Regions:
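Extended catalytic core of nucleotide-activated donor transferases of GT-like folds
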Residues: 11-13, 19, 27-31, 41-165, ...
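Short amphipathic alpha-helix
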Residues: 22-33, 214-215, 364
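Alpha-helix capping/helix-boundary segments
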Residues: 108-109, 160-162, 235, 299, ...
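Conserved catalytic-core segment of nucleotide-activated headgroup transferases in glycan assembly
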Residues: 182-265
Length: 373
């Protein structure tokens, strides 16, 4: 769309990425929209679960995380809301009266989304529901709490999710809208290699506990000569003890904007998707794939199938089928600098050519233009 638009985003949080990977992509996407000349405002609950836990759990690290966000994204206009207040509907009407496009992320309280949608007919904005989670597949009843019949369309972060909205929820207009890397923040850095293998990821409510055992913990036990580091949150005591037993260094919460430095200090990174993304939702890469490749680090993945041909498996990254193969690949890559270099270059090339937040911002504008016809 050639005209300059007023765009509103409602998300669980943009400020906090604590156990909240959605913030990664949304930050970069909103900045690219601003750079296209649009006016963007981001709304989030003042007491969001992610921000509350960030402040409660992380101490000084929380201050560092928020400060780094503010420095990295000065363009973003953040408005904190209190959706339980009686005057919230009036607040919404005043805020959205000149808005052209409203993006409603899936990890919002349904009552927030529904109150926004109740104003759509009166105010005339385009409303798009953005889903970058597996709930539509695993807990469909939770999605039905949203008044989806009022949206102009759904942005689904994978074709499998898009089909669920079309076939399962009866949404006529749905687009596959993958996440992508914010290449201004995620790019190769020059650092001395101090880590052999890094895994950046949260525990995931037992959605990949067996996979972490097979593809992270067991290889680390088999290769004690490697220095293996884990970043993430919500690891239960049993999991932490397993890391200790495998001589894996657990470092806890890592503000996402610090990830490029950790990748630069590491020889190889792992991608171990949650079970849903290697089974029923095969083909959907999570944000860590885009970010790791954008940082130019060789990536080795536990099983997942790139059904949408986003990448070049075997060239952009490696996929192993079991823990034994993971162990073999880690041993091989540790010794073969040429193989590491080629993997890193290939993955970085694919990201830059196809999977940046600028690519997705352009796609979003094309979708909005299609709706407006």
């Amino acid at each position: 769309m050639s005209q300059k638009l007023n765009i509103a985003l409602f998300a669980h949080s943009i400020v906090s990425d604590w156990n909240h990977g959605n913030a990664h992509f949304l930050r970069g996407l909103m900045r690219e929209l601003v750079r296209m000349g649009h006016t963007v405002r981001c709304y989030e609950e003042l007491s969001s679960w992610s921000l509350t836990n960030l402040m409660k759990q992380e101490g000084e690290r929380a201050i560092e995380a928020i400060d780094s966000f503010r420095r990295a994204y000065p363009e973003l206009d953040i408005c904190f809301c209190k959706s339980r207040d009686d005057d919230f509907p009036r607040f919404l009407e005043e805020e959205l009266k000149e808005t052209h496009i409203v993006l409603l992320h899936e990890w919002n309280d349904p009552q927030v989304v529904n109150k926004v949608l109740a104003l759509k007919k009166k105010l005339g904005f385009i409303a798009l529901f953005h889903d970058s989670h597996h709930r539509a597949h695993t807990r469909a009843g939770e999605i039905l709490k949203f008044h989806l019949h009022l949206v102009d369309g759904v942005l689904a972060f994978g074709e499998a999710i898009r089909r669920i909205y079309v076939d399962g929820f009866g949404i006529n207009r749905a687009w596959t809208f993958h996440e992508a890397a914010d290449v201004e923040q995620f790019h190769p850095l020059q650092r001395r290699k101090e880590i052999d293998v890094v895994w950046i990821g949260n525990w995931g409510d037992d959605e990949r506990s067996a996979e972490l055992d097979e593809f992270l913990i067991q290889p680390a036990q088999t290769l004690p000569e490697l220095r293996v580091v884990v970043h993430g949150v919500r690891y239960p005591d049993l999991a932490l003890q397993k890391l200790v037993n495998a001589n894996i260094e657990y470092r806890g919460y890592l503000p996402n904007l610090f990830s490029p430095q950790i990748y630069a200090e590491s020889v190889v990174s792992l991608h171990i998707p949650r079970r849903e993304y290697s089974n029923g939702l095969a083909g959907i890469p999570t944000i860590r794939v885009f970010e790791a490749l954008a940082c130019g680090i060789p990536l080795v993945c536990s099983p997942w199938v790139d059904q949408e041909n986003l990448f070049r498996p075997g060239e952009d990254y490696l996929v192993v089928q079991d823990g034994v193969e993971m162990t073999e690949q880690l041993r091989h890559l540790r010794r073969d600098g040429k193989a590491r270099y080629q993997l890193a270059e290939n993955g970085l090339q694919t990201i830059r050519e196809r999977h940046t937040c600028a690519h997705r911002a352009q796609q979003l504008m094309e979708i909005c233009q299609e709706i407006s016809r």
